[in-house]
């Protein structure tokens, strides 16, 4: 099969392949860029595999970087763009369920493609668009099937993360997982507990953003994959899956906030869940801010909304995902639009001014007064006017005395 209209990313990289070929080596585009082009999806970068060994690649191109030379990868810099060229290779045993103990460079494309995870990812393409399909990946693509290359049990034993990748591709592409591949996933799911949490999280986040995330979550639950994922156990995924049947999160922060909004975790358990998944501080901060409001949106006050203003987009999206009433979302949107200030710095008076006017001196009381002023302005008790705020501060200090 030949692709007649190549994306620009391939066209830009064609000189790299032809230079390798002119020197007597084989060179192909491989991996996700070929798969996604066949599926009509946008690609962002390309991967190149070649029979040239790393030192041979470096001798051909003047501007190179050893990005992973021990695994056969050299980056070639061409007109400001970096292209990773990886030597055809075979891999040894995987004692850590992640990386091969060692790799051996070979001259055979078939031997290289044999080690890849799924048939849809084991396609190679010549510089002119001719696609080489040694493992029926095109047929599996046509059928909408995710099938391991060769022995599924062997592929998943080599790298347990491939099980999460199977579920992720199912979510992203809407493909079914082939029966033998699915059986191996069920049998070897316990090995997921041996994989670094960060690697599992990246795949799970991609799954959650897939158009068929609900389908993949149902598979993961049915096959008890969830039992080997990090964090306190979520007893009931049904409402999460129902939500994702209707819509998807636009980013992984929203995805996590959505999941945790649908659990009955208390604050401590929610924090433990995020810690176990090794989420970033920014994600934790966002989730902790908006989940309490999503749990009780009708009871949220103007000041509650003001306090999470920095996360308003995430809040409104999670409210929509969880099926909050339109009038509830409209009310919160209206509160956001009508807020007199968006942050304390918007107040028309400062701590320095209160000190210079003699109303206050530096100390804890100053901080309390500024907090009181901020609250009063936000809820509409006073206007954000300098004189009004100064008067409010004086009265508050007098009351305290």
Curated annotation (Swiss-Prot):
- Work out whether the entry's keyword set contains Metal-binding: yes
Tell me the GO BP annotations in alphabetical order. RNA repair; tRNA 3'-terminal CCA addition
**For Mg(2+), which residues are the binding ones?**
45, 47
Q: Under which EC number(s) is this enzyme classified? A: 2.7.7.72
Reaction equations catalysed: a tRNA precursor + 2 CTP + ATP = a tRNA with a 3' CCA end + 3 diphosphate; a tRNA with a 3' CCA end + 2 CTP + ATP = a tRNA with a 3' CCACCA end + 3 diphosphate
Residues reported to bind ATP:
32, 35, 116, 159, 162, 165, 168
Q: What else is known?
A: A single active site specifically recognizes both ATP and CTP and is responsible for their addition.
Q: Assembly and interactions?
A: Homodimer.
Q: What is the protein name given in its UniProt record?
A: CCA-adding enzyme
Source organism per entry reads Leuconostoc mesenteroides subsp. mesenteroides (strain ATCC 8293 / DSM 20343 / BCRC 11652 / CCM 1803 / JCM 6124 / NCDO 523 / NBRC 100496 / NCIMB 8023 / NCTC 12954 / NRRL B-1118 / 37Y)
The encoding gene is: cca
């Amino acid at each position: 099969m030949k692709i007649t209209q190549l994306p620009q990313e391939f066209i830009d990289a064609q000189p790299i392949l032809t230079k390798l070929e002119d020197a007597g080596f084989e060179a192909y585009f491989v991996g996700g860029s070929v798969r996604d082009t066949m599926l009509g999806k946008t690609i962002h970068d390309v991967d190149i595999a070649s029979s040239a060994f790393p030192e041979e690649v470096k001798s051909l191109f003047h501007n190179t970087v050893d990005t992973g030379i021990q695994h056969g990868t050299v980056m070639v810099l061409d007109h400001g763009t970096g292209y990773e060229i990886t030597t055809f290779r075979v891999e040894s045993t995987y004692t850590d369920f992640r990386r091969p103990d060692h790799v051996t460079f070979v001259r055979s494309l078939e031997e290289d493609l044999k080690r890849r995870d799924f048939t849809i990812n084991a396609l190679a393409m010549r510089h002119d668009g001719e696609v080489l399909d040694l493992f029926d990946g095109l047929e599996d693509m046509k059928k909408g099937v995710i099938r391991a290359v060769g022995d599924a049990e062997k592929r998943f034993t080599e790298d347990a993360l491939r099980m999460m990748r199977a579920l992720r591709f199912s979510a992203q592409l809407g493909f079914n997982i082939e029966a033998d591949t699915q059986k191996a996933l069920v049998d070897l799911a316990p090995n997921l507990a041996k994989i670094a949490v960060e690697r599992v999280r990246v795949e799970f986040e991609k799954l959650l953003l897939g158009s068929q995330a609900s389908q993949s979550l149902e598979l993961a639950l049915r096959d008890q994959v969830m039992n080997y994922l990090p964090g306190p156990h979520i007893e009931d995924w049904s409402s999460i899956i129902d939500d994702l049947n209707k819509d998807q999160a636009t980013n992984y922060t929203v995805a996590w906030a959505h999941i945790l909004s649908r659990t009955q975790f208390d604050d401590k358990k929610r924090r433990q869940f995020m810690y176990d998944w090794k989420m970033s501080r920014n994600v934790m901060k966002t989730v902790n801010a908006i989940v309490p409001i999503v749990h009780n949106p009708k009871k949220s006050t103007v000041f509650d909304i003001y306090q999470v203003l920095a996360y308003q987009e995430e809040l409104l999206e999670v409210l929509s995902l969880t099926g909050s009433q339109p009038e509830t979302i409209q009310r919160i949107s209206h509160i956001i639009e009508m807020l007199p200030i968006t942050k304390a710095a918007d107040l028309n008076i400062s701590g320095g001014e209160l000190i210079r006017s003699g109303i206050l001196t530096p100390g804890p009381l100053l901080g309390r007064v500024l907090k009181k002023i901020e609250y009063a302005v936000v809820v509409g008790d006073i206007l954000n006017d300098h004189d009004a705020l100064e008067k409010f501060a004086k009265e508050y200090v007098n009351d305290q005395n």
